[in-house]
Amino acid sequence: SCGAAAIGYPCCENTCTEVYTDEYRWGVENNDWCGLKD
């Protein structure tokens, strides 16, 4: 699972590049934000 799921975002399906970090770690997949798995 990923932290971003707690606020309603999907988890990244594939390992993708981390593009932003706040309280969660974010990637972009299919032109949408996704949370990187912990």
Predicted features and spans:
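Extracellular/cell-surface secretome signature
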Residues: S1-D38
